Every structure is written in structure tokens, then in C-alpha cells.
Design a protein with these regions (language model features):
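Short alpha-helical transmembrane interface motifs in multi-pass membrane proteins
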Residues: 1, 31-32, 56-63, 120-125
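Signature of the 12-TM Major Facilitator Superfamily
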Residues: 1-4, 27-30, 88-92, 124, ...
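Specific alpha-helical transmembrane segments that line the substrate/conduction pathway
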Residues: 1-24, 149-168
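Transmembrane alpha-helical segments that form core, pore/gating elements
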Residues: 13-15, 19, 49-111, 139
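Hydrophobic/aromatic residues within transmembrane alpha-helices
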Residues: 19-21, 25, 81, 89, ...
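Cytoplasmic-side transmembrane-helix entry/capping segments in multi-pass membrane proteins
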Residues: 25-37, 61, 84-94, 148
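Hydrophobic transmembrane alpha-helices of multi-pass small-molecule transport proteins
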Residues: 25-47, 157, 166, 178-197
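Hydrophobic alpha-helical transmembrane segments of multi-pass membrane transport proteins
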Residues: 42, 62-77, 102-151, 162-167, ...
Length: 201
């Protein structure tokens, strides 16, 4: 369900950008967004759409929908950020997140649920800190600054596809034809969105 809900994030971003920033979107661009979402469906279902019938909404899905909505607000809000660099802004967010996590840390210590990572855990944490938490956020901020939230949001649908590609190299999973089809559809959807935008300009 996670990948399916995450696939709706570009739609959330476009809706919020339309309301907040008055960004225009036409039917061709909307069709491009739908194509990228269809590509996510292919990946989530492993090419078998009948498997989607077994999906059921649960509390985790509601939490994920809230997360996607809030991240969409964040993505659109980046266009209204102060005139400071991406690194300075990310540093500020990091300090806020650090302070916000302190009560949870004390709670885990108090309830004797604190688990310290071993060597493997430290390595994994290092990878998470450097790549998704730092570099990815910097690149996303720069992307929103350059091309806007609506266009940047479309690229988030590449996440499940690239996740599978990385799994092929690091987890020895098989690369299937539906991965290639999904990747092609996402780029086609982005092309439609971008091409129509250029013609309008």
C-alpha cells in the first residue's frame, strides 16, 4: 500500500500548488500525471493488477496519506521560502527535527525500550543520513527552486522504480519487464507534462 499511496503525492502537490500559488495545469498535463500514477500501479502490483483487489486500507495508510499531504505542503512551501540557501534551510529543519525527537528519546529510555545500533546499524544510519536525508533533500529543494513544485513532484514517482532497480543490484532481485515498462511510462508522463508546458509558454 505504501508505494500506491506515495504515487498520489504529485496529485497532492499539483492541487496545493493550484490553490496556493495559482499554478495553471491543463488536461494534457493532468493526463501525464495520471500516466505516472499508472506506472506506479504497475510496480506496486508487480505487473498483476488483480493483486490490487486484495489491498485493504488500514491505519498505516491513513498515516501515509497524511504524510503525503504534509510533504506536498512542504514542497509547495519551498517556493515561498526565505532568501537563504538550501543547506542553511535544511540545517534549520534538522535542528527542529532533533529537538522534536528528544521527548521520544527520553520516553524510550524511561520505558526501557532504547535500542542502540550495532556496527551494521551505524553503517545503515550513515547511508540514510548522507543520501536520502541530506543529498536527496538538497537536490529536491534545488529542483523546486528551478522548475517549481508541480513539475518536481512528478519525479517522486520514480522512487519505487529506482527502489526496485537498487534491489536488483544489492538484494539480487530479478529485473522484470514490468519495471522497464513502468520506467518508460513515468518518463512519458513527465514528457507530456513538460512538453505541453513548453508549448503553453
Amino acid at each position: 500500500n505504501l508505494g500506491l499511496v506515495q504515487g498520489t503525492m504529485p496529485a497532492f502537490i499539483i492541487i496545493i500548488a493550484r490553490v496556493w500559488l495559482k499554478e495553471q495545469i491543463n488536461l494534457i498535463q493532468l493526463f501525464g500525471v495520471l500516466i505516472t500514477f499508472f506506472a506506479v500501479l504497475i510496480v506496486v502490483s508487480s505487473g498483476d493488477f488483480y493483486s490490487l483487489r486484495d489491498l485493504q486500507l488500514n491505519k498505516g495508510d491513513v498515516v501515509m496519506i497524511c504524510a503525503c499531504t504534509l510533504y506536498a505542503v512542504y514542497a509547495v512551501g519551498l517556493r515561498k521560502k526565505p532568501k537563504i540557501g538550501a543547506l542553511a534551510l535544511l540545517t534549520f529543519f534538522s535542528y527542529v527535527a532533533f529537538l522534536g525527537s528528544i521527548p521520544g528519546l527520553f520516553y524510550e529510555i524511561y520505558t526501557d525500550h532504547l535500542i542502540l545500533p550495532g556496527l551494521k546499524g551505524i553503517i545503515i544510519l550513515g547511508v540514510i543520513i548522507i543520501f536520502p536525508s541530506f543529498l536527496a533533500q538538497i537536490f529536491f529543494m534545488k529542483g523546486v527552486e528551478k522548475i517549481g513544485p508541480a513539475r518536481s513532484g512528478l519525479y517522486t514517482n520514480l522512487v519505487p522504480v529506482f527502489s526496485f532497480i537498487l534491489a536488483v543490484f544489492f538484494l539480487n532481485e530479478l529485473f522484470q519487464m514490468y519495471h522497464l515498462i513502468s520506467l518508460a511510462l513515468i518518463f512519458f508522463g513527465i514528457y507530456l507534462f513538460e512538453n505541453k508546458r513548453q508549448k503553453v509558454k
